């Protein structure tokens, strides 16, 4: 359980460093260790875990994490999909389904597709942030790519994968993650250190 919470808090620390922080309560006006981007993610996550109550930790384990004002933690929505474009969020580009893109064997093209998806997702996330209430399908945390190897046609999510070839799935998965995260095709940051949109491979 501690490893699961540490993993979640590490992800939260990374997400929080990319968001505009909400105003801190009077008790949290000074810079706390978990807010210090110069510390490691593990140190920051452990510090944040030590400050959260059990009830707050429980609430943060859902796909909709409420704001925790006393610690300056903004509300966050963990659920967004981008298998072939930003999912269910108004007018965006819809690309072919994953299996069809895999049939191209063109990981450079897939990288370009997910760079475009990332651009659209960031624009949509900024729109949602202005409203002050980020809902499902409006965050920058994607449940993409699905890199499971598709070996059994009875599985209902096979069309979300890149097929049964491990080499192809590796190439396509890397292209998707690098495109979404704002990195170069070979995984190097384009500019400032960090990522623009984290991808959560399934």
For every predicted segment, state its role:
Residues 1-4:
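Positively charged n-region of N-terminal signal peptides that target proteins for export
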Residues 7-23:
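Bacterial N-terminal signal peptides
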Residues 24-202:
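Glycoside hydrolase catalytic-domain context in secreted enzymes
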């Amino acid at each position: 359980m501690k490893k699961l919470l540490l993993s979640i808090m590490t992800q939260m620390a990374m997400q929080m460093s990319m968001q505009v922080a909400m105003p801190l309560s009077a008790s949290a006006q000074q810079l706390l260790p978990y807010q210090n981007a110069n510390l490691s993610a593990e140190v920051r996550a452990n510090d944040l875990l030590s400050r959260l109550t059990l009830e707050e930790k429980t609430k943060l384990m859902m796909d909709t994490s409420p704001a925790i004002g006393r610690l300056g933690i903004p509300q966050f929505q963990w659920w967004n999909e981008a298998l072939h474009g930003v999912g269910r969020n108004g007018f965006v580009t819809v690309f072919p389904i994953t299996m069809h893109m895999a049939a191209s064997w063109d990981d450079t093209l897939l990288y370009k597709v997910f760079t475009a998806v990332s651009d659209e997702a960031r624009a949509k996330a900024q729109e949602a942030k202005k409203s002050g209430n980020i809902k499902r399908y409006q965050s920058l945390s994607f449940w993409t790519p699905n890199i499971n190897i598709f070996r059994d046609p009875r599985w209902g999510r096979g069309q979300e994968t890149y097929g049964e070839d491990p080499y192809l799935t590796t190439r396509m998965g890397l292209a998707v993650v690098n495109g979404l995260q704002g990195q170069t095709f070979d995984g190097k940051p384009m500019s400032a250190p960090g990522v623009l949109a984290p991808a959560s491979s399934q």
